[in-house]
Amino acid sequence: MRFCGTFKEGKIPYAEAEIVPYFLRFCELKGLSPFTVSLYKEKLDRFFRFLQGKTPVTSQDLLEFIGWLRERQPAPESQNIHLRSLKIFFRWAVAQSYLKKNPMHGVPMVRQRQKLITPLTISELQRLLDCARKTKQTGYRNTAIILLMVDTACWPGELCSLTLRDVRFEENLIRVDEKCGQRMLPISPSTRRALFTYLRRRKAFPREDAFFTTRHGTPLQVNNLQEIMDQLQRRTGIPRLYPYLLRHTAASSYLVGGADLETVRRLLGHTTYTITQRYVHLNQGDLARAQRRNSPVNQLR
């Protein structure tokens, strides 16, 4: 797909920052999700603000930006999100003949250690649900949120973007299309009941299309979701609790329960197995049980 802009081939009529809107429009036409386009915009804006109008961009500028980022966002993962956005942008700019050289060429990604994600235990999940159910005004909503995330491993942004049409009670399915492209995710009977129970009490806001709303009837946002988790964490005493951890917990549970990597990859909406493998976390008890179930030695007499 080639973007048709007003620039002439082989020329650089504007500073690199001025072609960012063309790049973002290209991404939209290509069908990338609003989440992805917004992410690119945020990271590119930050980089060009750092440059303060300097042009043309050089590899040295990019290395200095990495150093600047390291002081403010020490996590290598955060730095690499910026670098991936820049890499995609400059590759596009060269392919479209807006730039002759790619300043990202030879600039390495930041080395990051592989992290194992420790999921919530069944006991912690039960405490979380029990606490949510006791909340008078938002108990039905929060219960539905917890069950849906643990059942489907959906992204927080996908959950907040759900509309009334996306929840298909007759088919026991939800449709998500915020971050990883459109997917149809099955839901269990317990989750279906929780969603239906919440929906019956949500009728106070009949004109709002968003499935999950705040107490004021506005669509639930990811920051609202984090606030819900913060409140539940304080009440339950669970050491760590954030929306993504529910997704991690779901993915790990499916893998420990015997689901194959391809099934979990499709559930999570990942494009590669490398990302999915980060969710594989077996504690010693899980490992021992898996070994007893699957070792060929146990099949010998």
What residues fall within each predicted segment?
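Conserved catalytic core of the tyrosine transesterase superfamily
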Residues: 1-301
